[in-house]
């Protein structure tokens, strides 16, 4: 039953205001030409799968490594992380940067992800590592016991000397075991002990914040610090980042540490990141997808872009809205046309981006029958309503909410493509 009093009270203009919430205020961190945090656009990041670096032919290996990084950059990745896991990779960095620069990108898009060997590499290859735009430190394995603080301090001092931003990246798969054990012991003695999951989340947040504070004490400025706490479960991700946002103003990198493959990976990533972004939390994101053999690594970039575009935080390509089809839709023509329009946009976008700024905000509707076709088309910049069962074999086209013309015959796509081209030329110059 409808609660009229509640409806009258709640259905105010404020209730219908658009999300997201106001952005969580964070310090701005500049990585090359990319700005993370503050009111800057959410940054899309990826990680290269990498190649084996042949110690006897580092330059040739570096070129193959750079090829993947360049593919990710062309797909829209604004930062690309590489595993800084060997002396060979450290030696390859200048050659990788050279290839990236040749392609017209800034070599500073590279983020070096160091683990156990990071302290050694920054000492042995200081001139190479400083060519990176940012380095990532994992507090859980940069060193253990008495060596932890010593190695952490050396890396931070190196970053300060060379003016390199640092991401302090905590991961629940490699969490500082001493900190975790300490919190577990304290919890076991408590009169009101919490679950182990709560203590694990607390340890993640404390590890990140304690490490960031330690970096500040050493001398790393606030505009050089990004933090992250990676987990694999969506609810843990939301809990941990909500706590980080309440506790600090460091720039935040979002993502599940291992999202998984296929639909599961994409849905988990979307669920977690969307909630946080809608609540104003997050400055840079990555979709850590397990690609099936043969799948392009650039898929993770596309997922991040789709998340940001779907919730209105950024625009990368014209949006194509299309109906799913039902018993009213006639044949596969609207599905085929949808695919053709999407493919055409992909082909044209490199040119449009250069010549037609703003085209990424364009909205196109491809609908399959008269029920929602005209109405949905009127909400788009361009819309086409194909005929369903029992309808005349014609397709109505709408421009900026008004009827424009009717198409029919076997060349609907070619004619609609021409309409798209004309619209882009007329409105985005």
Swiss-Prot record:
InterPro entries: Dihydropteroate_synth-like_sf, IspG_bac, IspG_bac-typ, NO2/SO3_Rdtase_4Fe4S_sf. Pathway: Isoprenoid biosynthesis; isopentenyl diphosphate biosynthesis via DXP pathway; isopentenyl diphosphate from 1-deoxy-D-xylulose 5-phosphate: step 5/6. [4Fe-4S] cluster binds at residues 323, 326, 369, 376. It holds the Pfam family GcpE. GO terms for molecular function: 4 iron, 4 sulfur cluster binding; 4-hydroxy-3-methylbut-2-en-1-yl diphosphate synthase activity (ferredoxin); 4-hydroxy-3-methylbut-2-enyl-diphosphate synthase activity (flavodoxin); iron ion binding. It catalyses: (2E)-4-hydroxy-3-methylbut-2-enyl diphosphate + oxidized [flavodoxin] + H2O + 2 H(+) = 2-C-methyl-D-erythritol 2,4-cyclic diphosphate + reduced [flavodoxin]. Its EC number is 1.17.7.3. Keywords: 4Fe-4S, Iron, Iron-sulfur, Isoprene biosynthesis, Metal-binding, Oxidoreductase. Binds 1 [4Fe-4S] cluster. Its cofactor is [4Fe-4S] cluster. Coiled coil: none annotated. GO terms for biological process: isopentenyl diphosphate biosynthetic process, methylerythritol 4-phosphate pathway; terpenoid biosynthetic process. Belongs to the IspG family. HAMAP family: IspG (MF_00159). Converts 2C-methyl-D-erythritol 2,4-cyclodiphosphate (ME-2,4cPP) into 1-hydroxy-2-methyl-2-(E)-butenyl 4-diphosphate. PANTHER family: 4-HYDROXY-3-METHYLBUT-2-EN-1-YL DIPHOSPHATE SYNTHASE, 4-HYDROXY-3-METHYLBUT-2-EN-1-YL DIPHOSPHATE SYNTHASE (FERREDOXIN), CHLOROPLASTIC. NCBIfam families: ispG_gcpE (TIGR00612), PRK00366.1 (NF001540). This is 4-hydroxy-3-methylbut-2-en-1-yl diphosphate synthase (flavodoxin). The gene is ispG.
